């Protein structure tokens, strides 16, 4: 499993310590950018991305929960982003243009699905994605309850990838923790975005929190059984 800590959940008073630790242990940094319109919250910014970039060597994945993603792509490229992750709900009528713009800036393309958005919504450009993320909670806030129906969506993405010979990673955003790791792996997840319940709330010390998380993931991995689709 790959791990992508969500920086909206980190302790900003320990910014340097936690960024440096995550950089030496994780696979990605997950950075949520919200505009207060697409979701009812405001979080991180292109400036924040630029500050993380000063300390980070691992890829910075910027999740755009904004109504106008086209306004952020060039800013985030300048700030040092490596991935731009887009919601199909916000790119209708400009999906191909925005994906091409991300590529022109030498960044990778992520697509992310809200719980109620079907995989079919990105049928005509799914092959252009480097990573596809499934929201397993309603977007906008940390610490929300897991939506079990999303396990079928993960299994659908895995089957689509195999059927079409695609190579995108399958990522999960929302309530990735001890209670869900086994089910998520069984359904086809490759990457966990970990936040409050999965990482940062385990201990004051990031080193100890990471140790606890890793032990939980390894224990879940040993119990994984194939996911059975629900009716």
Swiss-Prot record:
Assembly and oligomerization: Homohexamer. Trimer of dimers.
This enzyme's EC code(s): 5.1.3.-
Protein name (record): D-allulose-6-phosphate 3-epimerase
Family recorded in the similarity comment: Belongs to the ribulose-phosphate 3-epimerase family. AlsE subfamily.
A Gene Ontology term for the protein's cellular component: cytosol
Active site: residue positions: 32 (proton acceptor), 173 (proton donor)
Class of enzymatic activity (EC top level): isomerase
PROSITE patterns reported in the protein's UniProt record: RIBUL_P_3_EPIMER_1, RIBUL_P_3_EPIMER_2
């Amino acid at each position: 499993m790959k791990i992508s800590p969500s920086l909206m959940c980190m302790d900003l008073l320990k910014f340097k310590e936690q960024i440096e630790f995550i950089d030496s242990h994780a696979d990605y940094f997950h950075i949520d950018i919200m505009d207060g319109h697409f979701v009812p919250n405001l979080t991180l910014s292109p400036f924040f991305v630029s500050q993380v970039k000063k300390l980070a060597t691992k890829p910075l994945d910027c999740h755009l929960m904004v109504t106008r993603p086209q306004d952020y792509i060039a800013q985030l490229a300048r700030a040092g982003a490596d991935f731009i992750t887009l919601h199909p709900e916000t790119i209708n009528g400009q999906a191909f243009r925005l994906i091409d713009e991300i590529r022109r800036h030498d960044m990778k393309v992520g697509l992310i699905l809200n719980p109620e958005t079907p995989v079919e919504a990105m049928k005509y450009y799914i092959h252009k994605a480097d990573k596809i993320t499934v929201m397993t909670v309603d977007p906008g806030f940390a610490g929300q309850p897991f939506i079990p129906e999303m396990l079928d969506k993960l299994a659908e993405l895995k089957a689509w990838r195999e059927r079409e010979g695609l190579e995108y990673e399958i990522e999960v955003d929302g309530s990735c923790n001890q209670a869900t790791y086994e089910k998520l792996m069984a359904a086809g997840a490759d990457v966990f975005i970990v936040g409050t319940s999965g990482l940062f709330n385990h201990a004051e010390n990031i080193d100890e929190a990471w140790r606890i998380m890793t032990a939980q993931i390894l224990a879940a991995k040993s119990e994984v059984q194939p996911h059975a689709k629900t009716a």
